[in-house]
């Protein structure tokens, strides 16, 4: 009998792009996730279950071995403190950029910078690598307000079209990292459940290649 495999999926935009990809890989929930309040779903494979989580929780569930696989954005993985997972595959969906941004045309001050972001770990590492002294302020939303209101000189945030920045008088500055959705696996599970994991990984890999070949 095959060992049960649990795949942790991120809520939101990523979920909307992940489900069609999984369907191409012949992994389909037995009920409509969008119409259910459930968080755990059976699939057309008796040994595969899907769990719907907040994006930032996906690496934690995989790291602790509660989920075998996880689907999460690279931005979330960069910010997570994990030791027990492998990043196996770039799913090449939900693409965007992690960037610095500031008020249009406003030069940076000649002092220690103030930076607002929800990506504290990544922002600190980036400015340290650049040799720039910066205090990073943790925010949870509406990043665009921080430079406008004088809370910060720059923000570090996800940029898709850039329209939200432009609408608030901001401009994207420096690219920190291109972001896309990744498939991760628990290290122990990859060894103990290899015979179950590898076929699924191959199906998903082919689905990604099929998407790219369009």
UniProtKB/Swiss-Prot annotation:
Q: What is this protein called?
A: ATP phosphoribosyltransferase
Per the record's keyword annotation, is Kinase included, yes or no? no
Supply the enzyme class, top level. Answer: transferase
Q: How does it assemble?
A: Heteromultimer composed of HisG and HisZ subunits.
Cellular compartments annotated: Cytoplasm
Provide the catalytic activity annotation. 1-(5-phospho-beta-D-ribosyl)-ATP + diphosphate = 5-phospho-alpha-D-ribose 1-diphosphate + ATP
UniProt pathway annotation: Amino-acid biosynthesis; L-histidine biosynthesis; L-histidine from 5-phospho-alpha-D-ribose 1-diphosphate: step 1/9
Q: Which top-level group of life is the source organism from?
A: Bacteria
Q: Which family does it belong to?
A: Belongs to the ATP phosphoribosyltransferase family. Short subfamily.
Q: Which GO terms describe its biological process?
A: L-histidine biosynthetic process
May I have one GO cellular component term? cytoplasm
Keywords, ordered alphabetically:
Amino-acid biosynthesis, ATP-binding, Cytoplasm, Glycosyltransferase, Histidine biosynthesis, Nucleotide-binding, Transferase
Q: What is its EC number?
A: 2.4.2.17
Primary site of residence: cytoplasm
> Which InterPro entries is this protein grouped with?
ATP_PRibTrfase_cat, ATP_PRibTrfase_CS, ATP_PRibTrfase_HisG, ATP_PRibTrfase_HisG_short
Job of this protein: Catalyzes the condensation of ATP and 5-phosphoribose 1-diphosphate to form N'-(5'-phosphoribosyl)-ATP (PR-ATP). Has a crucial role in the pathway because the rate of histidine biosynthesis seems to be controlled primarily by regulation of HisG enzymatic activity.
GO MF annotations, alphabetized: ATP binding; ATP phosphoribosyltransferase activity
UniProt remark on domains: Lacks the C-terminal regulatory region which is replaced by HisZ.
């Amino acid at each position: 009998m095959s060992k049960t495999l649990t795949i942790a999926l991120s809520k939101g935009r990523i979920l909307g792009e992940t489900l069609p990809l999984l369907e191409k890989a012949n992994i389909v929930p037995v009920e409509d996730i969008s119409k259910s309040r459930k968080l755990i779903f059976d699939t057309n494979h008796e040994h595969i279950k899907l769990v719907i989580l907040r994006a930032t929780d996906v690496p934690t569930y995989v790291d602790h071995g509660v989920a075998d696989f996880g689907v999460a954005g690279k931005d979330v993985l960069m910010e997570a403190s994990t030791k027990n997972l492998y990043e196996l595959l770039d799913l090449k969906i939900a693409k965007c950029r992690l960037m610095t941004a500031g008020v249009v045309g406003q030069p940076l001050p000649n002092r220690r910078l103030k930076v607002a972001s929800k990506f504290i770990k990544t922002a600190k590492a980036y400015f340290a690598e650049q040799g720039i002294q910066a205090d990073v302020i943790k925010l949870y939303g509406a990043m665009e307000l921080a430079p406008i209101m004088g809370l910060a000189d720059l923000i570090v945030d996800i940029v898709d079209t850039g329209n939200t920045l432009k609408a608030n008088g901001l401009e994207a500055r420096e690219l920190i990292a291109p972001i896309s959705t990744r498939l991760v696996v628990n290290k122990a599970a990859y060894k103990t459940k290899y015979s179950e994991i590898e076929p699924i990984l191959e199906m998903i890999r082919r689905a990604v290649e099929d998407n790219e070949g369009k």
